[in-house]
């Protein structure tokens, strides 16, 4: 979901992968932009959930909204203003003693390594206004430190980490809204152009990122050369008109199309909610007149009719794999993707 504030700063866009190498000045603006984005999303939750004290169901894919909010501020403070080894970047000792927080109790509330998921629903958290104040104060402290920070990868590592962490939780706010049926203004993907098979010749490919790439997560290192055999891949994602044919051909009733574990998953979903199609789909099939795809899917609390040329959304790996078996295809490996 695109942010609504500044889009281009200096030579690097704050929505660009080049943010991995962003310098101090760009990072400062990007951190403010990410926080504005968090608060904008929070505002939508306040409209929908403030009267019920932001209560949401305790399910594995969600966090309580107030916990989500406080955790973002806690994470940045923990790794930046409270971290005396922040200048060492990824060479810092993650277990090193931290300075005290400006807010008592935050480690017991918001440290995701120590607070089990389900227990987050039973915490007595501060109110939304107090948490907003905590986020403001910690951001200001972190930005003051950033002004005095050298422009090198080690010194900027945790500032970039805090930025990407907050962006990741921005995604969590969005998918939580979809799960709960809360209204958000998120652009729909348009119809795809025609898909054709693309033959990719055999090659060797560098998978992962080198240290010189700027910021990298630990699971992106080290880079390694891998042999990639020749393969064929479609140039566009699977669209609804293709997936509807799979459903119409009994794809959700034919065990032979499913991985054994996927079939067990499907039966559990069917017992739970009568699942016979992708998540959030209310109707799916071939239209009686014209033979076009007919898909009605809930998007952020609204029932919308999907166009046949739009990409399929909200399918699990099991469903995607079953479609591939039906279509005589397979899912791409990471290096192929």
How would you label these PLM feature ranges?
Residues 8-15:
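Acidic, carboxylate-rich catalytic segments that either coordinate divalent cations
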Residues 51-52:
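Amphipathic, low-complexity, repeat-rich surface-exposed segments
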Residues 2, 19-34, 39-45, 56-335:
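Extended beta-strand/loop cores of jelly-roll/beta-sandwich
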């Amino acid at each position: 979901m695109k942010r609504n504030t500044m889009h281009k700063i200096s030579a690097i866009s704050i929505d660009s992968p080049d943010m991995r190498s962003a310098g101090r000045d760009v990072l400062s603006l990007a951190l403010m932009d990410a926080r504005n984005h968090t608060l904008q999303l929070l505002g939508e939750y306040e409209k929908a959930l403030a009267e019920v004290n932001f209560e949401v169901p305790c399910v594995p894919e969600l966090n309580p909204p107030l916990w989500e909010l406080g955790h973002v501020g806690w994470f940045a403070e923990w790794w930046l203003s409270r971290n005396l080894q922040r200048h060492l970047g990824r060479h810092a000792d993650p277990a090193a003693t931290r300075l005290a927080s400006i807010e008592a109790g935050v480690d017991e509330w918001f440290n995701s390594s120590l607070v089990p998921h389900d227990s987050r629903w039973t915490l007595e958290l501060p109110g939304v206004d107090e948490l907003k104040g905590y986020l403001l104060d910690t951001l200001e402290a972190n930005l003051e430190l950033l002004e005095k920070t050298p422009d090198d990868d080690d010194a900027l590592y945790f500032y970039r980490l805090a930025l990407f962490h907050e962006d990741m939780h921005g995604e969590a706010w969005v998918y939580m809204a979809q799960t709960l049926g809360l209204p958000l203004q998120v652009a729909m993907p348009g119809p795809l152009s025609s898909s054709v098979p693309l033959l990719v010749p055999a090659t060797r490919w560098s998978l992962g990122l080198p240290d010189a790439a700027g910021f990298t997560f630990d699971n992106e290192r080290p880079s390694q050369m891998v042999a990639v055999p020749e393969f064929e891949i479609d140039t566009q994602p699977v669209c609804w008109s293709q997936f509807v044919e799979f459903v119409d051909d009994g794809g959700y009733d034919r065990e032979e199309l499913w991985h054994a574990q996927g079939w067990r998953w499907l039966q559990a979903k069917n017992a739970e909610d009568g699942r016979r199609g992708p998540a959030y789909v209310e109707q799916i099939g071939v239209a009686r007149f014209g033979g076009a795809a007919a898909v009605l899917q809930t998007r952020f609390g609204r029932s919308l009719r999907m166009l046949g040329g739009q990409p399929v959304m909200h399918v699990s790996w099991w469903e995607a794999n079953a479609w591939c078996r039906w279509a005589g295809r397979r899912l791409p490996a990471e290096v192929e993707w």
